[in-house]
C-alpha cells in the first residue's frame, strides 16, 4: 500500500506542476501517514541524514565558485578564446558557442548556468550573423548540458554520494565523454552550416589566439587546480571546491578586477538560493529512497530486470531506457539520489563498473534536460530570446538529441572511453 500511495501522490503532484522537492517530500509524508506504522518524525530525520554529508558541501561551494568566475568576467574571455580557435570555420559562431560552453563547463558544473553565461552573449551574436533564431537557441541548450559532464559536475557529486563512488574518479571519467559530446555537436553544426551557407565573418589570427589565451588562462587554470589537487592528495573534492572559491575571489578582484562587493554579494546570493533548492531536493529524494528501500522496491526491480535482461548488454539497454524516460520527467539530482541505490545491486551483480555507469547515468540525465516535458535547458535558453516559440526550439534541438544519443550508446558499450584516464590518475 505504501508504494501505491507514494506513486499515486507523486504522479498527481507532478501533473499539478508542484516543485519537485515538495512533490517528493509531500508524497513521502502522505505514504507514511496512510501506512501509520512508522513515526512521522523519522521522515524528517531521514531528510536530515540525506544532507548531513561533508561531501555534499562541494555543491554550494562549486556553485559559488562558478558564479564568482562568471561575474568576474570569465565568460567573455572564454568566448574570445573560442572565437580565435574555431571562429573562422563554417558555422563559426555556433562552434564558438559550443567550445565556450565546454570551457565554462570546467568552471561552473551546472548546465543552466552554462547556457545563461554563454548564451546571453552568443545567441544575439548568432542571430545578428544570420543564423536561424531557433537553431541559435537550440545549439546553446544542447551545448549547455556539457556543463554537467565535464568536471566539476554537481550531478557527479550527487551520484558519488548516493552509491558511495569516488567523486574524484567520476570527475576524471567525465572529461573524455564531455569532449566527445562537444566535438560531435561541433561536427553537426559544421555540416548544417555548410548546407545553409552560414559562413563565418570572423578572421582569427595567431596573435589574437595568444592574446585571448593570456586573458583567459586564469579561468582555465581552475579545473586543473581542482583535479590536480584531488589526485595529488593535497585536498578532498569538498576542500577543492573551497579552494576554487578562494581562487575565484582572487582572480575576480586582483587579476580581472571585475568583482566588487556588490556583485560578490549577488554571486553568493544566486549560488545560495540555487544550492538550497538542490539540497532540499536531495533531502526529500533521500527520504523517498529510504521508503522504497524499506518496501524492498530495489530488490523487486533487480529481480524483474534480471529475468528480462539475459546479458549485461541488454541490462544496460534497459537501464538506459529507464533513465532517459526518468530524465524527461524528473529533476536530475532527485532521479540520481533515488535510482542510484536502486540500481546498485544490479550493477554489482552484473559486474558493471560503478564509475563507468556513473558517466552513463549523468549523460542520460543531461539528455533529459533537452527533452520535454521537463527540458530545463530548453526553457532556460528560450528565456534568452523570448519571441521564439518552444515548439520551434524543440524541432531544432531534436537532431542534436539524436547526435547525443549516439554518443550515449558509445559511452554505454565502450567503457574505456570513460575509464581510460583513470589508469593515469589512479
Residue ranges and their predicted role:
Residues 1-426:
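Alpha-helical transmembrane segments of multi-pass membrane transport proteins
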Amino acid at each position: 500500500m505504501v508504494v501505491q500511495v507514494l506513486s499515486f501522490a507523486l504522479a498527481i503532484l507532478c501533473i499539478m506542476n508542484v516543485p519537485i522537492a515538495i512533490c517528493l517530500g509531500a508524497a513521502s509524508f502522505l505514504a507514511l501517514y496512510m501506512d501509520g506504522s512508522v513515526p512521522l518524525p523519522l521522515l524528517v530525520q531521514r531528510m536530515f541524514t540525506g544532507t548531513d554529508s561533508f561531501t555534499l558541501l562541494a555543491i554550494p561551494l562549486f556553485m559559488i565558485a562558478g558564479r564568482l568566475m562568471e561575474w568576474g568576467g570569465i565568460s567573455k574571455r572564454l568566448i574570445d578564446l573560442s572565437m580565435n580557435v574555431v571562429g573562422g570555420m563554417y558555422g563559426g559562431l555556433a562552434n564558438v558557442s559550443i567550445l565556450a560552453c565546454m570551457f565554462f563547463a570546467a568552471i561552473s558544473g551546472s548546465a543552466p548556468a552554462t547556457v545563461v553565461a554563454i548564451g546571453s552573449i552568443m545567441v544575439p551574436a548568432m542571430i545578428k550573423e544570420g543564423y536561424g533564431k531557433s537553431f541559435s537557441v537550440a545549439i546553446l541548450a544542447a551545448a549547455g548540458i556539457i556543463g554537467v559532464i565535464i568536471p566539476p559536475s554537481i550531478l557527479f557529486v550527487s551520484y558519488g554520494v548516493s552509491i558511495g563512488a569516488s567523486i574524484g574518479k567520476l570527475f576524471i571519467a567525465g572529461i573524455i565523454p564531455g569532449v566527445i559530446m562537444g566535438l560531435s555537436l561541433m561536427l553537426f553544426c559544421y555540416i548544417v552550416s555548410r548546407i545553409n551557407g552560414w559562413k563565418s565573418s570572423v578572421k582569427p589570427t595567431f596573435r589574437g589566439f595568444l592574446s585571448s589565451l593570456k586573458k583567459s588562462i586564469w579561468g582555465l587554470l581552475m579545473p586543473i587546480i581542482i583535479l590536480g589537487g584531488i589526485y595529488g592528495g593535497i585536498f578532498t573534492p569538498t576542500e577543492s571546491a573551497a579552494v576554487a572559491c578562494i581562487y575565484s575571489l582572487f582572480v575576480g578582484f586582483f587579476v580581472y578586477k571585475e568583482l566588487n562587493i556588490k556583485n560578490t554579494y549577488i554571486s553568493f546570493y544566486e549560488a545560495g538560493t540555487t544550492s538550497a533548492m538542490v539540497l532540499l531536493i536531495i533531502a526529500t529524494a533521500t527520504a523517498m529512497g529510504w521508503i522504497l528501500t524499506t518496501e524492498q522496491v530495489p530488490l523487486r526491480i533487480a529481480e524483474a530486470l534480471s529475468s528480462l535482461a539475459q546479458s549485461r548488454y541488454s541490462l544496460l539497454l534497459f537501464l538506459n531506457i529507464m533513465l532517459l524516460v526518468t530524465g524527461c520527467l524528473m529533476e536530475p539530482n532527485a532521479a540520481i539520489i533515488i535510482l542510484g541505490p536502486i540500481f546498485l545491486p544490479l550493477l554489482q551483480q552484473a559486474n558493471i563498473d560503478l564509475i563507468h555507469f556513473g558517466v552513463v547515468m549523468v549523460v542520460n540525465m543531461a539528455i533529459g534536460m533537452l527533452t520535454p516535458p521537463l527540458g530545463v535547458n530548453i526553457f532556460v535558453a528560450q528565456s534568452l530570446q523570448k519571441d521564439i516559440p518552444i515548439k520551434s526550439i524543440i524541432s531544432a534541438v531534436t537532431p542534436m538529441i539524436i547526435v547525443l544519443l549516439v554518443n550515449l550508446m558509445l559511452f554505454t558499450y565502450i567503457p574505456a572511453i570513460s575509464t581510460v584516464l583513470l589508469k593515469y590518475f589512479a
